[in-house]
């Protein structure tokens, strides 16, 4: 599937559908080939019923711009992006710093199993 993006904007943004016990939400993550895993904000994960304060989740140590942090690992029922769908998909629950143009990242954990083409001349991204 081919999805258009704005090649002048700098970030490759596209729609992604997330499902959890409380419902479905369409988000707009940034494609991040430097991110090992997909990261979603805790607010978004709460919205679809996949994250709750006070519950202990497995964590992973993640290197961020401000150092190494322990990030909860949370399972979403379904993540669909760029025409591909993964069920029972583990993501990182972490709110990115304010001021960024996005609060979610689609990382290598999702795209690694596919062929990825990002064409900045035409403004299309393909995941097959």
Model-derived segments and their meaning:
Residues 1-128:
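Pepsin/retropepsin-fold aspartyl endopeptidases
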């Amino acid at each position: 599937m081919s999805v258009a993006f704005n090649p002048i904007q700098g970030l490759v943004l596209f729609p992604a559908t997330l499902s959890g016990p409380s419902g479905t939400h369409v988000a707009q993550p940034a494609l991040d080939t430097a991110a090992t895993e997909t990261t979603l904000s805790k607010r978004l994960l709460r919205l679809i019923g996949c994250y709750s304060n006070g519950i202990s989740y497995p964590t992973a140590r993640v290197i961020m711009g401000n150092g190494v942090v322990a990030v909860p690992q949370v399972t979403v029922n379904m993540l669909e992006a760029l025409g591909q769908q993964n069920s029972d998909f583990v993501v990182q629950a972490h709110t990115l710093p304010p001021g960024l143009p996005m609060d979610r990242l689609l990382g290598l954990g999702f795209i690694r199993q596919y062929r990825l083409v990002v064409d900045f001349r035409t403004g299309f991204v393909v995941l097959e």
